[in-house]
Regions:
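Charged, amphipathic alpha-helical coiled-coil/dimerization segments
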Residues: 74-134
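Pre-recognition alpha-helix immediately N-terminal to the DNA-recognition helix
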Residues: 9, 36-43, 104, 131
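N-terminal leader segment of winged-helix/HTH proteins
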Residues: 1-28, 32, 79-81
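C-terminal regulatory/oligomerization modules of transcriptional regulators
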Residues: 1, 127-160
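Alpha-helical linker/hinge and terminal dimerization helices associated
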Residues: 10, 14-17, 21, 105, ...
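N-terminal helix-turn-helix DNA-binding core of bacterial DNA-binding proteins
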Residues: 19-65
Length: 160
């Protein structure tokens, strides 16, 4: 297998996972990014007992532009499932949380997804899952390092 074929294999696997999430979102009448709002808030409420996320955190975690996230939030505000308010601790931040109706909606949307993820993960031993995570992180770190070096070279050339 060539280097290119190995890289293509990684991206095809990532794309396949993304398509599964995209189909789930589509089956519920929303985009993947819209679903991610509910996913991230539910994840936080279960793991951190924090039932909200800031707009900045959404942008960072989804690696999406603020304008895109803002448009998605505006659409979801109209559903009545989420609400947005100014963070009392940092008035420059906006907090996105679920309304009571939104909590029920998010449970119906996200909890079966969490269950499917856990069922899929159960197909692997703990050692296999640890290895999958380690290898994915290793590839991401190596890719980031290589790209940073190339960006640095381009910046140095354009500054000359």
């Amino acid at each position: 297998m060539t280097k290119r074929e190995r890289v293509d294999g990684i991206y095809e696997a990532i794309q396949k996972v993304n398509q599964v999430y995209g189909k789930w979102a589509s089956a519920h009448g929303m985009t993947l990014y819209e679903m991610q709002i509910y996913y991230r808030i539910m994840e936080r409420s279960l793991q951190k007992e924090q039932a909200y996320i800031t707009q900045k955190e959404l942008c960072d975690e989804l690696d999406a532009p603020k304008t895109s996230i803002n448009s998605i939030i505006k659409r979801q505000l109209k559903t009545g499932y989420i609400e947005m308010e100014v963070n009392p601790v940092n008035r420059r931040e906006k907090i996105i949380s679920l309304t009571e109706t939104g909590k029920q909606y998010a449970r119906e949307l996200v909890l079966p997804l969490f269950q499917s993820e856990e069922e899929a993960a159960a197909q692997f031993t703990e050692q296999e899952m640890t290895e999958v995570i380690r290898m994915q992180e290793k590839f991401a770190d190596a890719l980031a390092k290589s790209m940073e070096e190339k960006v640095s070279i381009v910046h140095n050339l354009s500054a000359s």
